Regions:
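Hydrophobic alpha-helical segments with transmembrane-like composition
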Residues: 49, 73, 77-78, 119-184, ...
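Alpha-helical transmembrane segments in multi-pass integral membrane proteins
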Residues: 4-33, 49-63, 126-133, 159-171, ...
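Active-site helix-to-loop segments that bind/position phosphate- or nucleotide-bearing substrates
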Residues: 70
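His/acidic/aromatic-lined binding-pocket segments of jelly-roll/cupin-type domains
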Residues: 38-40, 202
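Intrinsic disorder in cytosolic terminal tails and internal cytosolic loops
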Residues: 359-372
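Short alpha-helical catalytic segment bearing the HExxH-like zincin motif
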Residues: 65, 145-147, 295
Length: 372
């Protein structure tokens, strides 16, 4: 989904969903494929809830949790950052690409603390401390999502320490605080920007709630969770009425898409086995297997392709959808698949452990590890 969104960076502006021809409508939808991020946060919440549940009564459970998360995220991130820095460095030598690609980041464009923030996935909040709150500076536009992920993992680890078998209650307490801040308007305070309490925890919590509803809740608890997710979806959609700017719509659409996806997980659970064996879902298994690698490596090539075609005048709705988008998918696969084989797979915890980790998700979506 994010490949589609990033391929649209230089396409002609679309006014509204029904303001033009079919290409216009498709571009309007494609420019909102960033909803893959809130959906990814829901999947992450579901998986982490499963991990916490499986480890909460085991000796050394916290250590296992931390090791898995560290090796899953950081070594591939470091290699991807090195690749992106090299790609930007080469692209910067081209006057043509330097003129048209706004995403290029030279090595000197980031301070030492910003490099540390990118490599540790802390840049979303580290700038408050070391850059006087001037705002984050990302080497790649996808790193901000990992900054939130690491915060989610940290909070989940604290839940494991403080509550053990009652970790879900800890997540409920954090969710209540996050919801109160959001409803009161305090979540949008500049001082909270980049922290999990700026509203993004809610997206993660939807996944945790879905896992609890499916695996642990009694009927009354399941009904309460479904009701809360449904209410959130409806309220977010109603809040979007009359809004046209992406800024105004962004978080309401994030809430609506995340809550509705969590609802889908709960509702579709009885058919997991059937869906996982359906011929229609089989291609997603191959894509999902390498999705984190594609996620980490697609940003630079896709934005360069989009900028290059825009630079020669091919930025219409038709040319972007018919030429730029297919090339973006191809480039993402050509870079992401070798990255998976050579880098990510080396840091996996083995086939048996990977299969166990995948089982934290309903079978029908288990292959989808990251938005792509």
């Amino acid at each position: 989904m994010l490949i589609v969104y990033h391929a649209m960076f230089y396409v002609d502006e679309s006014i509204g969903i029904f303001a033009g021809d079919v290409w216009h409508t498709l571009v309007w939808a494609a420019r909102r494929m960033w909803i893959g991020v809130p959906i990814f946060f829901v999947i992450s919440g579901y998986c982490i809830a499963g991990s916490v549940r499986s480890l909460q009564d085991q000796p050394g459970g916290l250590k296992q949790f931390a090791q898995r998360r560290f090796f899953r995220i950081y070594p591939p991130l470091w290699v991807a950052c090195a690749m992106a820095a090299l790609t930007w460095q080469v692209a910067e030598t081209s006057p043509f690409l330097s003129q048209y690609c706004r995403q290029i980041k030279g090595v000197g464009d980031l301070s030492i603390w910003q490099w540390i923030g990118n490599l540790t996935a802390t840049e979303s909040w580290l700038h408050h401390i070391f850059s006087s709150g001037s705002g984050p500076n990302y080497l790649m536009g996808i790193i901000w999502t990992l900054c939130y992920e690491e915060q989610f993992y940290l909070i989940a680890a604290l839940m494991l320490i403080a509550f053990r078998s009652k970790a879900f209650l800890g997540s409920v307490a954090v969710t209540a605080i996050a919801a109160l801040l959001f409803l009161s308007g305090l979540a949008v305070s500049p001082s909270l920007a980049g922290f999990f309490l700026d509203g993004h925890w809610l997206l993660f919590a939807f996944g945790w709630a879905a896992h609890h509803a499916i695996n642990e809740s009694r009927l009354a608890g399941k009904i309460c969770i479904i009701g809360a997710l449904l209410l959130t979806t409806v309220a977010a959609l109603l809040a979007m009425r009359g809004e046209n700017s992406d800024t105004a719509l962004h978080f309401d659409l994030s809430l609506a898409s995340a809550a509705s996806f969590a609802l889908l997980l709960i509702i579709a659970h009885p058919w997991d086995a059937v869906l996982s064996k359906a011929r229609l879902t089989q291609p997603f298994a191959a894509v999902g297997k390498i999705s984190y690698s594609v996620y980490l490596t697609h940003y630079a090539p896709v934005t360069l392709i989009s900028a290059a075609f825009a630079g020669v005048g091919l930025h219409s709705h038709f040319s972007t959808l018919a030429v730029v988008l297919p090339l973006s998918f191809l480039a993402s696969w050509l870079v992401g698949y070798p990255f998976y084989l050579l880098i990510e797979r080396r840091f996996s915890t083995g086939r048996k452990k990977s299969a166990k980790a995948a089982s934290c998700l309903p079978e029908s979506i288990a292959p989808q590890k990251a938005p792509c």
